[in-house]
Amino acid sequence: MAGKADLGHTGISDNIVERQIFVPQPNNAWSFTQGLMCGQASVVVVLLVFIKFFVFSEAPPSSGAAKSKKKDISGVIVKREAKNTDDDDGVENGDSAKLATILEKTYYDVNNHNPESLDWFNVLIAQTISQLRCEALLSDNIYHSLNDFLETSDLPDFMDKITLTEIDIGDDFPIFSNCRIQHSADGTGRLEAKIDVDLSDTLTLGIETRLLLNHPRPLTAVLPVQLTVSMVRFSGCLTVSLVNTNDTDFVGTSKEENSSGGGTALMFSFSPDYRLEFSVKSLIGSRTKLQDVPKISDLVDSKLRNWFSDRCVEPKFQVVRLPSMWPRSKNTREPVGAGKTEKVNGNE
């Protein structure tokens, strides 16, 4: 009985073993794919975290951070000038110290330095004036410009249309000499250049018109008038200086000038002892003509002198705003043949 039991037990065990042997193994292919995808995803996450926190910086959360950044940037620029104080005396002392530093570093003594000739400057000015004359004479541009100005000008009722009869823009050039740097006489301590100017040339403008007598009825009488004005000589002392347009002494009267912001401007004026000579020729009448009437010459001469004195003679002055001198790509030029020359040299 025991043997049978053993045999039976052995048979059962064999069956169990056989069943265990023939049980199909589970498929692990899907588990491997999941592991591979999870591994790649984890690598991508680690790379993103590294790039975010170690490569890119965070954006400033508020305007306060931007202000602090500006303060940090301001510390990068080396400022060698002394700090300005709030009072006027401190500002004046700072400007005086700045001018003294400029004179010291340029080795210029305003009290003992000899006047300088401006031969090189005369050449540059002559080239500029020559170019302007060529442009003015090109296609009679100066005639059309003056004629358009006269046609659009408001004339009094007793004057007929003005017609141009003669234009002469000269062929000589001004001579600048005896340049010296001095402190301004107004007590501000500003540096200014005193330059002697001399021009001996003939600049002529001739016109003709008619004086209309409209009383007691329109066009009761007509008086033809021909007038030719020539400037033959000018000499004087030119004062030139650089000013800041934000200064109260140089603030413009128009809103457009004030809204354009601050900057550097060129201020110039002429001394009251200038010399200006005119030659005025007149011809009045139709049948019986009066030539070179002294009263007309004196009137024209006085009007031209007053016009010049009211604009350019001390204490009046002219202020011309200077453009920005900072190099810009839009202002960059090169010779026309430069590119072709480089290509030829490269091919060789």
Curated annotation (Swiss-Prot):
Subcellular location: Endoplasmic reticulum membrane
GO cellular component, one term: ERMES complex
Regions crossing the membrane: 36-56
Cytoplasmic side, ranges: 57-348
Main subcellular location of this protein, as a coarse class: endoplasmic reticulum
Signal sequence, renumbered to the chain: none
An MF annotation (GO) of this entry: lipid binding
Record flagged with keyword Transmembrane helix: yes
Membrane topology per record: Single-pass type I membrane protein
Residues in the Lumenal compartment per record: 1-35
Residues annotated as domain SMP-LTD: 114-323
One Pfam family linked to the record: MMM1
Keywords assigned by UniProt, alphabetized: Endoplasmic reticulum, Lipid transport, Lipid-binding, Membrane, Transmembrane, Transmembrane helix, Transport
Matches recorded under InterPro entries: Mmm1, MMM1_dom, SMP_LBD
Biological process annotations from GO: mitochondrial genome maintenance; mitochondrion-endoplasmic reticulum membrane tethering; phospholipid transport; protein insertion into mitochondrial outer membrane
Region (Disordered): 328-348
Record PANTHER family: SMP-LTD DOMAIN-CONTAINING PROTEIN, TEX2 PROTEIN-RELATED
Subunit structure and binding partners: Homodimer. Component of the ER-mitochondria encounter structure (ERMES) or MDM complex, composed of MMM1, MDM10, MDM12 and MDM34. A MMM1 homodimer associates with one molecule of MDM12 on each side in a pairwise head-to-tail manner, and the SMP-LTD domains of MMM1 and MDM12 generate a continuous hydrophobic tunnel for phospholipid trafficking.
Domain commentary: The SMP-LTD domain is a barrel-like domain that can bind various types of glycerophospholipids in its interior and mediate their transfer between two adjacent bilayers.
Similarity comment: Belongs to the MMM1 family.
Cited HAMAP family: Mmm1
Purpose: Component of the ERMES/MDM complex, which serves as a molecular tether to connect the endoplasmic reticulum (ER) and mitochondria. Components of this complex are involved in the control of mitochondrial shape and protein biogenesis, and function in nonvesicular lipid trafficking between the ER and mitochondria. The MDM12-MMM1 subcomplex functions in the major beta-barrel assembly pathway that is responsible for biogenesis of all outer membrane beta-barrel proteins, and acts in a late step after the SAM complex.
Protein name in the entry: Maintenance of mitochondrial morphology protein 1
Organism: Clavispora lusitaniae (strain ATCC 42720)
